[in-house]
């Protein structure tokens, strides 16, 4: 073999060995890099998911409240004008009369929990965004008989009934309407499964008030119920 060829062959062999060696060691390294990349992306996705979920919860708890507050501000002047100059209860809408969902119905005041909000007509999804809602198939306070039903959100849309569990027997609830003011005294505070809670809205001859909301907080498997008897109607 010519002398000048051997060094060239040696260099070729040495280079090939180095290349094979580098390839052999590079595969696990690439796998390690790929594994770390997957973990980084997974961590990033988890952070993004947590941020999205946190933002959604914040919107439910506080963002929806802004929407309800705007509705309350728009509704209050009209109903307060009616309250300031009430008409006789006999002139109030009769059972079965047409109502406008989402329209101002009354102002509810519960001193125990510091509640003072406009009640709207209706308990559909849209109406309850504006505030507590009157079950339109139940009685009106000015009827002088029957059960008045009002529902309210527990944790969203300004959460009017967030602390309804703290309303106890003996506490008072005031309904201020364009046909007089009505004071109710609480007699019961209890919980029922959601599927059976409708029984509390059955009509009676006794003039009563029933408040309903979801229970426990942040869930809806049950209904928290407050019942109260009419103790002081004021025309």
Kindly label every feature range from the protein language model.
Residues 1-39:
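Terminal targeting segments of Actinobacterial cell-envelope proteins
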């Amino acid at each position: 073999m010519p002398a000048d060829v051997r060094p060239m062959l040696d260099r070729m062999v040495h280079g090939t060995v180095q290349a094979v060696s580098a390839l052999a060691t590079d595969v696990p390294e690439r796998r390690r890099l790929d594994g770390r990349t997957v973990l980084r992306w997974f961590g990033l996705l988890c952070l993004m998911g947590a941020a999205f979920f946190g933002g959604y919860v914040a919107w439910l708890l506080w963002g929806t409240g802004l929407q309800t507050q705007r509705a309350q501000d728009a509704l209050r002047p009209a109903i307060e004008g009616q309250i300031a100059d009430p008409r006789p209860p006999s002139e109030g809408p009769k059972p079965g009369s047409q109502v406008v969902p989402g329209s101002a119905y009354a102002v509810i005041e519960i001193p125990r929990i510091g509640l003072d909000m406009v009640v709207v007509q209706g308990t559909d999804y849209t109406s309850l965004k504006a505030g507590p809602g009157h079950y339109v198939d139940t009685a009106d306070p000015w009827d002088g008989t029957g059960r008045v039903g009002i529902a309210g959100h527990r944790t969203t849309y300004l959460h009017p009934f967030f602390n309804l569990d703290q309303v106890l027997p003996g506490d008072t609830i005031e309904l201020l309407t364009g046909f007089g003011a009505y004071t109710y005294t609480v007699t019961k505070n209890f919980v029922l499964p959601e599927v059976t809670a409708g029984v509390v809205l059955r009509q009676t001859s006794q003039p009563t008030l029933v408040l309903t909301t979801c229970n426990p907080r942040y869930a809806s498997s049950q209904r928290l119920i407050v019942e109260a008897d009419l103790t002081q109607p004021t025309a």
